[in-house]
Regions:
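Bacterial N-terminal signal peptides
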Residues: 19-29
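Tandem repeat scaffolds
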Residues: 33-255
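N-terminal secretory signal peptides that target proteins for export/translocation
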Residues: 1-12
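Hydrophobic alpha-helical segments, especially transmembrane helices
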Residues: 15-16
């Protein structure tokens, strides 16, 4: 008699059964990951696509492109590489129009977007490290979960913008306007915020270690559970309750 035929089929072990769902979850995670998330980035061939209003250039390699003065309102450039894009940083040049642009989860490292119009743009989840945004218009823009470390945005208006959960460390936003902005859980550590305006802004749980708030206006801001106030610089700062830091022993903590 063939002994092999009498053997019971091998049952899967408990460990094997438990591993199957885990393998499935890992596969789903890989399948859902953005193109290029593992290994080198993969982009579409966009060589025949003209840069124009509402153009679809998502997942395109546009690094080092010059877009000074172009009207690109509503452009769709999510998941694209826009590193070192030159939108101009000369006030004598025409402004680049990116109003309402969709540039989510993109790479904009070291891009020059001074004076650019980015009002109502969706930039959430993008890497904007080292971006030049001086005098750019970012009113109502969505910058939640962005990385802005080292970026410079002196005198730029961010009125009613969403910067929740953004990381903006060791940057410059002196003279910028964040009135009415959602800044909850933002990481501002080490950033220059002199003369910035935060009237009515949401700064709950913000990380403010080492920030410079000299001459800043925090009237009506909500900074409940904000951290790092002990190491922040306050001088002639209008505190959330309307008092002046100089009258509070050089601090706005508790005010």
């Amino acid at each position: 008699m063939n002994i092999e035929l009498l053997r019971r089929p091998t049952r899967p072990t408990r460990r094997g059964l438990l591993a199957l769902p885990l393998i499935g979850l890992l596969w789903m995670g890989v399948a859902a990951a953005p193109v290029g998330a593992a290994g080198s980035p993969t982009y579409r061939d966009c060589s025949q696509i003209a840069l124009a209003p509402n153009a679809d250039v998502h997942r395109c390699d546009l690094s080092d492109a010059t877009i000074i003065g172009l009207d690109l309102h509503g452009i769709y450039a999510s998941w694209s590489d826009l590193s070192r894009v030159n939108g101009g940083c000369d006030p004598d040049l025409p402004r680049t129009n990116l109003a309402g642009a969709r540039i989510a989860r993109a790479i904009l490292v070291d891009a020059k977007l001074c004076d650019a119009i980015l009002s109502d743009a969706d930039l959430h989840g993008s890497d904007m490290s080292g971006v030049a945004l001086e005098d750019a218009s970012l009113n109502r823009a969505n910058l939640s979960w962005t990385i802005l470390s080292g970026s410079q945005a002196a005198f730029a208006p961010f009125v009613d913008a969403n910067l929740s959960n953004a990381t903006w460390r060791d940057g410059f936003a002196n003279g910028a306007t964040f009135d009415g902005a959602d800044l909850h859980r933002i990481d501002f550590r080490g950033t220059d915020l002199r003369s910035a305006s935060f009237v009515g802004s949401d700064l709950r749980y913000a990380r403010l270690n080492g920030v410079d708030l000299t001459d800043a206006d925090l009237t009506g801001a909500n900074w409940r559970q904000a951290t790092g106030l002990a190491s922040a610089t306050f001088s002639n700062t209008i505190c959330p309750d309307g008092t002046n830091s100089d009258a509070n022993g050089g601090t706005c903590a508790g005010h």
